[in-house]
Amino acid sequence: MRIDVLTIFPEYLDPLRHALLGKAIEQGKLAVGVHDLRQWATDAHKSVDDSPYGGGPGMVMKPEVWGPALDDVSSGTASTQDLQSALPHLSKPRHDDIHGVEARSYGESEDSDKPLLIVPTPAGKPFTQADAQAWSAEEHIVFACGRYEGIDQRVVDDAQQRYRVREVSIGDYVLIGGEVAALVIAEAVVRLIPGVLGNRRSHEEDSFSDGLLEGPSYTKPREWRDLQVPDVLTSGDHARVDRWRREQSLARTWQRRPELLDAAELSDADRAYLETLEED
């Protein structure tokens, strides 16, 4: 996969070289280019914004800058050095690489030669785990990180000639710019590229992978500050452990995100357990 990011703060995207994404770069599964949008500004001040038509507060990012930038990135003519991994020591396998199962994709990318353009915006469609799974099969993803009052809408409209455009929100709140959202989405997507995480079960059992929140996790020691690991987890009875984990997942979802239960695939045993929670 290749990821390109257009931003006026290239340094903000340095985390893309670290941790899991750095590992993917080191493995050759990911290439990342971060582009300074001001390279395409033509005035002496390298300005990228102007006042909005119709009046109002704030500034709007200019189409004369964004248009050529997106043109160059889509055609591969933008000049930038790809990020280098900050983790050059990852030639050694880690525990989740050793015990993994066969890597395979979650699906195929959309049948199109156009790159996927993601525009983070609070006015966008909510980003979901299903999006992350689908986009993990993409060959080329471009992030357009807006600032101020956003990007001139004509940029988004025009980009549809060269891209498959998705305006996406990561939550019902407003950030200063799209860089944080780009980091969030990139990590959610890249970790699902086959072979990046190592053990496929690590993300098959994640929150939202089956429509529910993930339950609590425990490790050694068995007792810590007078708090015990639940006995069922040390029982050796795998069927009991699986059922306990399922019930914990159901309970946490019921308590924190009950609306998710409407779309989740629930067994008769699941429904019976939820009824006991409601009775309590």
UniProtKB/Swiss-Prot annotation:
Reactions performed catalytically: guanosine(37) in tRNA + S-adenosyl-L-methionine = N(1)-methylguanosine(37) in tRNA + S-adenosyl-L-homocysteine + H(+)
Q: Which UniProt keywords apply?
A: Cytoplasm, Methyltransferase, S-adenosyl-L-methionine, Transferase, tRNA processing
Q: Which SUPFAM superfamilies match?
A: alpha/beta knot
From the UniProt entry, list the residue stretches annotated as the region Disordered: 71-94
Which residues bind S-adenosyl-L-methionine per the record?
146, 170-175
State the Gene Ontology BP annotations.
Answer: tRNA N1-guanine methylation
- InterPro entries from the xrefs? Alpha/beta_knot_MTases (IPR029028), tRNA_m1G_MeTrfase_C_sf (IPR023148), tRNA_m1G_MeTrfase_TrmD (IPR002649), tRNA_m1G_MTases_N (IPR029026), tRNA_MeTrfase_TRMD/TRM10 (IPR016009)
Where in or outside the cell it occurs: the entry states: Cytoplasm
- Function field: Specifically methylates guanosine-37 in various tRNAs.
Protein name, entry field: tRNA (guanine-N(1)-)-methyltransferase
The lineage, from the top, is: Bacteria, Bacillati, Actinomycetota, Actinomycetes, Mycobacteriales
The encoding gene: trmD
